[in-house]
A protein has these predicted regions:
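Glycine-rich beta-strand-turn "strand-cap" elements at beta-sheet edges
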Residues: 1-3, 44-60, 83-111
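Intrinsic-disorder/low-complexity regions
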Residues: 1-4, 18, 77
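Short, well-ordered beta-strand segments in beta-rich or mixed alpha/beta enzyme
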Residues: 7-14, 45-79
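Short, surface-exposed ligand-recognition loops at beta-strand->loop->(often short) alpha-helix junctions
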Residues: 14-27
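Residue-level signal for secondary-structure boundary sites
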Residues: 19-21, 69-71, 107
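An amphipathic, aromatic/His-enriched active-site/gating alpha helix that lines ligand/cofactor pockets
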Residues: 30, 34-43, 64-101
Length: 111
């Protein structure tokens, strides 16, 4: 990866219908504020999307980092491993154990 490009990191996790609002709140008010407190200043943006299924809710997270070094600061040297705090694991049914990484080539604002 070109180290000067912004990096997009994606990951999915699934939880019960009942735990979905709990997990969403946890992401917004605990997980990502804690990441920022730990000094991961290169995390620029987090998008949280959901897809409702019959018995569960799928969460799709898209994180934007300024560099691959910031991704490593966030997730460690083995940065392809998923970052899932223990409190989040308790409310998730299952989750991807790895994250995907992409170089952001262009962002079009159409409004």
């Amino acid at each position: 990866m070109n180290k000067s490009n912004k990096i997009i990191r994606t990951w999915k996790g699934w939880t019960t219908l009942e735990n979905a609002p709990i997990y969403e709140d946890m992401l917004i008010n605990e997980v990502f504020p804690e990441v920022k407190k730990k000094g991961v200043t290169g995390l620029e943006k987090v998008s949280i999307s959901t897809k409702h299924h019959e018995n569960e809710v799928e969460f799709f997270l898209v994180l934007q980092f300024d560099t691959i070094e910031s991704v490593k600061l966030f997730a460690g040297e083995d940065y392809e491993n998923a970052y899932i705090p223990d409190n989040a694991k308790r409310v998730l049914l299952r989750y991807e154990t790895t994250a995907q990484h992409y170089e952001l080539k262009e962002e079009l604002i159409l409004n």
